């Protein structure tokens, strides 16, 4: 299980600005298949939507975001009715290249499962805004996938913004989200509809 506690540090700058944050954990391979991981992410969004009014949250201002594999999941759940928009940081949008990598040693995906769970092949039906970010110092494949996914959304008439954070790599890009003046932080605030 990817622990939500590992990412609690990301919430601090938003909480200090009066923005509520829900951190979601999810199972990892080999304990779950990619289909199960994506289904779990959908279930988490539905649970949050049901509980949010009880917690005093505004159900019209729910934005899903994620980093790396969480960035992949954020795009896979974007059709959930309760979501206003999405933001993906350093996500993976085409899973077929993973089939021959060490990552698939734990995921055990076949070609059909990779296709079902590749955002670039499963564009959402809704026209919710999605902001995509990658670091300029990310691996070329990560940057290519992000740029290709942005292009696919544009070609389908879906709203998308794509930006590369100068000098950021797969890990340091999170500093841009934590910093109130960072482009990613500001984009998330804008997707929420302002403070």
Report residues per predicted region.
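Alpha/beta-hydrolase superfamily serine-hydrolase fold, recognizing
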Residues: 1-195
């Amino acid at each position: 299980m990817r622990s939500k506690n590992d990412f609690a540090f990301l919430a601090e700058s938003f909480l200090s600005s009066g923005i509520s944050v829900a951190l979601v954990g999810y199972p990892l391979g080999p304990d779950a298949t990619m289909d199960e991981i994506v289904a779990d992410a959908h279930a988490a969004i539905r649970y949050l939507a049901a509980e949010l009014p009880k917690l005093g949250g505004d159900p019209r201002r729910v934005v899903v975001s994620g980093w790396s594999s969480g960035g992949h999941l954020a795009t896979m759940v974007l059709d959930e009715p309760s979501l206003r928009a999405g933001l993906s940081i350093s996500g993976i949008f085409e899973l077929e290249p993973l089939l021959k990598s060490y990552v698939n040693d734990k995921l055990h995906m076949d070609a059909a499962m990779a296709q079902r769970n590749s955002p670039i092949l499963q564009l959402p039906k809704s026209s919710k805004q999605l902001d995509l970010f990658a670091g300029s110092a990310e691996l070329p494949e990560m940057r290519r996938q992000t740029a290709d996914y942005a292009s696919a959304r544009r070609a389908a008439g879906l709203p998308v913004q794509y930006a590369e954070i100068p000098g950021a790599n797969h890990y340091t890009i999170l500093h841009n989200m934590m910093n109130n003046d960072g482009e990613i932080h500001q984009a998330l605030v804008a997707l929420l509809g302002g403070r």
